[in-house]
Amino acid sequence: MKRLLIAMVGLVLFCACAGTAPAQNGRGAAELKLNGKAVSVDYGRPALKGRQVEDMLGQLPAGEVWRLGADKSTTFKTATDLVFGDVTVPKSEYSLWARKEADNSWKLVFNKQHGQWGTDHDASQDLPGIPLKETKPATPAEQVTIGLTKTGDGGEITIGWGDMELSTDFKAK
């Protein structure tokens, strides 16, 4: 009887504690093929939940990075060398970030470290920043959305959240 009581108390405690783990956001992914080689991104999808993206990202000081998602860092994989303007991104796996500039513009940052928690950014592992174009989307995005779209002989990466959309073009080298 004593063992049964201990087992029941243990089960109740286990069930009570199981509900207190922090909820993780859903994950999103996008992929495209360039010259038969895969380019992909995997990211966390935080939701605004009634908040404004300007209020949240507006607090980020110039020179700091946004992890482009939630939870585990956003992962970008490419099986071919890519060219973003004058920046070459060699085929590899990276964590992906956006750095806020002093003029409130954004730069896309590929970091050689990947798989880390989304707040563990080592700037010494960054490739040069790539300017992002900011526009207003036709429809605001409640959750962070990252898309890869084929355009001619290259592609476009688009990052949307709320009424902000960031994008840049790239080509296979």
Question: What is each PLM-predicted segment?
Answer:
Residues M1-L4:
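Positively charged n-region of N-terminal signal peptides that target proteins for export
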Residues A7-A16:
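Bacterial N-terminal signal peptides
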